[in-house]
């Protein structure tokens, strides 16, 4: 193993059933997962993934999965569904760590997703410091709950939690209809809630000695809990209609939220195309800098309306993006307005672009004039940014 570099190892991209061949490496690295959960994952989900693996000879030493999810994205007053990738199972054998294995796999996966014009990808990091150098940034904070008086009692269909009953197969279409409608009313970005989604989720929670519990039944469903019993018991998700407490939910919100999901812009054009104007038409010229996916670099001409977005690259923008990357290296601000002399309105690093699209960056920060920029120009850009409808309400609560 000594002296072997990632570039000398064989890169493989298993798909379908071949992804299951990486189970031994998964178990070696994620040894804290229960056998029951691992069995579930490799029976129900692994074959749906696309794998990336480095082998030393025939031995897998580093891996990751791209797990496809149907993501609902608000587009004006409607939604579009895109298959996007959740990066999971990032694992390297201990003797091969800190040698660039993950770097090679992650960059290869990003390039493949870029080739498919995917707007973004997301993951749940074990350590956010690992992914920040690859321009990932947090976009979703998960609400925390405590369990009140109402432990899980009974078994099978008679299992209850407080005043809630465990979901049965007959409840699936009603739960899917309720959840999808709820998400569309409250969020701009979420995983599609349908019968296959809740069927898989029930199996996943059962693998963690938990389940799905309902407030109400059939077409009268008013809320649900996703509960996992492993360790101390955990409410993974709590959704209800109306005032909290009206349905006897045994989960109490603490008011705290924990950052759990990071995302990265993959294709800048596709990402910017998700935005809409709140009214009328708004034109912006945005300089983007990406140290990994160089096709994103340059000046993007954007015309946002209430119904769509036209985004195309200015071929003269490459030099501007290069100059911006040099300022980034000197710890200059990563999100700023351009001066009146520049050929663009706004400069965005990849983390700044991602944060801004998902409502994590304020318009005032975006339009902060620097380097002698005209104050009126900064205010003009700020007004434009305030007129753009971003995807501010994110609910990416899938935990792997």
What is the role of each PLM region?
Residues 115-119, 125-144, 270-271:
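Conserved active-site alpha-helix within GNAT-family acetyltransferase domains
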Residues 258-400:
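C-terminal functional modules
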Residues 49-53, 63, 89, 210-214, ...:
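Short hydrophobic/aromatic beta-strand element in the GNAT-like acyltransferase core
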């Amino acid at each position: 193993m000594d002296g072997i570099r990632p570039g000398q190892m064989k890169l493989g991209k298993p798909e379908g059933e071949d992804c299951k061949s990486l189970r031994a490496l998964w178990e070696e690295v994620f040894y804290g997962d229960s056998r029951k959960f691992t069995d579930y994952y490799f029976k129900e989900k692994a074959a749906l993934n696309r794998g990336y693996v480095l082998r030393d000879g025939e031995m897998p030493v580093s891996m990751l999965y791209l797990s496809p999810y149907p993501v609902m994205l608000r587009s004006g007053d409607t939604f579009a569904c895109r298959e996007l990738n959740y990066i999971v199972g990032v694992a390297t054998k201990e003797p091969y760590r800190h040698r660039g294995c993950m770097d090679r796999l992650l960059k290869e996966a990003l390039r493949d997703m870029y080739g498919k014009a995917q707007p973004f990808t997301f993951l749940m990091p074990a350590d956010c410091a690992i992914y920040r150098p690859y321009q990932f940034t947090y976009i979703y904070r998960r609400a925390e709950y405590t369990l009140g008086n109402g432990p899980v009692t009974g078994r099978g269909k008679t299992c209850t939690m407080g005043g809630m009953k465990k979901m049965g197969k007959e409840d699936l279409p009603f739960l899917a209809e309720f959840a999808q409608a709820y998400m569309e009313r409250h969020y701009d970005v979420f995983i599609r809630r349908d019968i296959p989604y809740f069927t898989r989720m029930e199996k996943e929670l059962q693998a963690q000695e938990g389940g799905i519990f309902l407030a109400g039944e059939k077409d009268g469903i008013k809320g649900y809990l996703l509960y996992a019993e492993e360790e101390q018991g955990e409410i993974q998700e709590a959704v209800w209609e109306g005032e909290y407490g009206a349905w006897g939910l045994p989960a109490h919100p603490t008011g705290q939220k924990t950052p759990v999901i990071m995302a990265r812009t993959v294709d800048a054009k596709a990402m910017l195309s998700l935005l809409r104007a709140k009214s009328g038409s708004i034109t912006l010229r945005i300089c983007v800098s990406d140290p990994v996916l160089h096709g994103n670099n340059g000046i993007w001409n954007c015309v946002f309306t209430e119904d769509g977005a036209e985004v195309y690259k200015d071929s003269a923008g490459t030099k501007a993006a290069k100059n911006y990357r040099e300022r980034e290296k000197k710890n200059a601000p990563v999100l700023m307005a351009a001066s009146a002399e520049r050929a663009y309105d706004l400069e965005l690093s990849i983390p700044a672009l991602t944060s801004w699209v998902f409502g994590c960056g304020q318009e005032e920060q975006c339009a902060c004039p620097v380097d002698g920029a005209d104050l009126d120009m900064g205010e003009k850009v700020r007004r434009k940014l305030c007129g753009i409808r971003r995807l501010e309400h994110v609910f990416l609560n899938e935990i792997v």
